[in-house]
Amino acid sequence: MNEEYDVIVLGTGLTECILSGIMTVNGKKVLHMDRNPYYGGESASITPLEDLYKRFKIPGAPPASMGRGRDWNLDLIPKFLMANGQLVKMLLYTEVTRYLDFKVTEGSFVYKGGKIYKVPSTEAEALASSLMGLFEKRRFRKFLVYVANFDEKDPRTFEGIDPKKTAIGEVYKKFDLGQDVIDFTGHALALYRTDDYLDQPCCETINRIKLYSESLARYGKSPYLYPLYGLGELPQGFARLSAIYGGTYMLNKPIEEIIVQNGKVIGVKSEGEVARCKQLICDPSYVKDRVEKVGQVIRVICILSHPIKNTNDANSCQIIIPQNQVNRKSDIYVCMISSAHNVAAQGKYIAIVSTTAETKEPEKEIRPALELLEPIEQKFVSISDLLVPKDLGTESQIFISRTYDATTHFETTCDDIKNIYKRMTGSEFDFEEMKRKKNDIYGED
């Protein structure tokens, strides 16, 4: 370990593992350490079930009705992958897909007036849906056609709208969309957590709706994918990539000190030895004095013995509870997966509820979601701080990831990865460039 590295990475969360993989593919000498004996950090999948009981300090062993402990892989952070999103592109370009198997999530649902409705995934479903009335459907369809034809590079598709200036709220007005349709569009399709986006230029929202519909078009049932054996497989896949390119991995390594000289990182001390480095990447838990809290997320892992009611017995789904429906500022999400994904014992379902906490009693805030899941066999409640770095890290060369937010997909995580990459290298993250580098090493195959 007493060596010189270009980059040392602390923590094996998804953000850290992807950056570690990218850096090694770029020819950097990388040492990657984690104080835990397992991969994944905050975004780990916990197995066996007994370990989750211990982690959440639930007394006693899981009851026999839970089946074999080894059959469980429980994600601490619930997220799906958008089928056409940035993370899938990163997986494809780096060929990490060869280590993973994905399943399409069976449906996406939205909560309205105390009931859940399927988010239409085909035109026929849209016409038959009772989410909106007939005239609303026509106006909504016009809006979706506009979005589908919209091209940032072709002003003829703008129809008098300035994508960089016109607020999306104005665009909704132009198409005469009602409040329910606006809620549905912003929260179930563009996947915004709050209504703060309404005053922002419309370009971002249009691109988000495009991402949703392109992701949906790939597989048809829903725009979401989920890896067999749980999300913990993702960081491990990128760790393998890093190892192939000569990255060094050490788990179960207590980190004693990050050594800084004249305001700049020069190394990391572990078990009395010092590894030197030019740059450091880490998650907030390794540098508590360099991050600040900007909020909290509540997540509740619920074990069920039944599919969620009114989901057509889906073995996996997402439910979005728009904030307006429950008088909140942020949406509440439910991600549900099951034994079909090799993450639970036969006949069992895992539903994870999450949202940004807004009061001192976050458990009360998520009651509408828990009511949809009844009866719940066992629940595990976690409230975690949302932490962000206090500075960009360009002076100290210590680059800190943000904690995982309450969104149910990895787009914001990928934004963070690209942002850190730019701060570290001074250049934009380029998927194509990465692909070329891989071909140089492997040759064209």
From Swiss-Prot:
One of its GO terms (molecular function) is GTPase activator activity. Pfam families: GDI. Its main location: cytoplasm. The modification Phosphoserine is found at residues 130, 382. It comes from the Eukaryota. The modification N6-acetyllysine is found at residues 112, 269. Keywords: Acetylation, Cytoplasm, Golgi apparatus, GTPase activation, Membrane, Phosphoprotein. It is found in: Cytoplasm; Membrane; Golgi apparatus, trans-Golgi network. GO terms for biological process: negative regulation of cilium assembly; negative regulation of protein localization to cilium; protein transport; small GTPase-mediated signal transduction; vesicle-mediated transport. The modification N6-succinyllysine is found at residue 57. GO terms for cellular component: cytosol; Golgi apparatus; membrane. The modification N-acetylmethionine is found at residue 1. It is a peripheral membrane protein. PANTHER family: RAB GDP DISSOCIATION INHIBITOR BETA, RAB GDP-DISSOCIATION INHIBITOR. Belongs to the Rab GDI family. GDP-dissociation inhibitor preventing the GDP to GTP exchange of most Rab proteins. By keeping these small GTPases in their inactive GDP-bound form regulates intracellular membrane trafficking. Negatively regulates protein transport to the cilium and ciliogenesis through the inhibition of RAB8A. Interacts with RHOH. Interacts with the GDP-bound inactive forms of RAB3A, RAB3B, RAB3C, RAB5A, RAB5B, RAB5C, RAB8A, RAB8B, RAB10, RAB12, RAB35, and RAB43; binds RAB3D to a lesser extent. Interacts with DZIP1; this interaction negatively regulates the interaction of GDI2 with GDP-bound RAB8A. This is Rab GDP dissociation inhibitor beta.
